[in-house]
């Protein structure tokens, strides 16, 4: 992480916005809890695209980034046909990828969900855990933070 001039830390963030489709809800018209993982993944993919190191680039560089930890706090139910905004923020990237998420109602900005995911770096050639993120990734992050 790189502090800026006022000694605060800069982060890279991206948003994914959509309207909840019918096939994501249960009989009560509330989003089934398992779909939250999908929503986080969609926002994470946009964030990684912004960085220039998406899952295809990861594989091409010889690394895998499996999820090793995930936490979701369901603050308020998400409903069928509700417009939502999923915000993903990269908060750690030197030794692992830690991304924090906030899901809000797009219209009222009410907080509906908070979450985070942690991804470890694994060498694809031998499935060994790496102690640092690849230099190609950290260079791209640092370039965006300038």
Where are these regions (language model features)?
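Generic structural detector for well-ordered beta-strands
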Residues: 17-21, 73, 118
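Glycine-rich, flexible loop/turn motifs
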Residues: 18-21, 27, 54, 61, ...
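A broad, structural micro-motif
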Residues: 31, 65-67, 112
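Hydrophobic beta-strand-centered segment that forms part of the acyl-chain substrate-binding groove
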Residues: 47-85, 89-97
């Amino acid at each position: 992480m790189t502090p800026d001039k006022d000694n605060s830390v800069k982060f890279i963030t991206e948003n994914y916005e959509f309207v909840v489709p019918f096939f994501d809800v249960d009989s009560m018209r509330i989003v089934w809890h398992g779909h939250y993982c999908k929503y986080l993944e969609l926002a994470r993919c946009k964030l990684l695209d912004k960085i220039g190191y998406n899952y295809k680039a990861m594989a091409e560089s010889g690394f895998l980034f499996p999820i090793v930890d995930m936490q979701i706090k369901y603050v308020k139910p998400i409903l069928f046909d509700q417009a939502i905004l999923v915000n993903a923020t990269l908060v750690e990237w030197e030794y692992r990828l830690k991304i924090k998420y906030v899901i809000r109602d797009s219209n009222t900005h009410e907080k509906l969900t908070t979450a985070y995911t942690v991804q470890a770096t694994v060498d694809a050639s031998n499935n060994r855990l790496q102690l640092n993120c690849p230099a190609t990734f950290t260079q791209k992050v640092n370039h965006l933070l300038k």
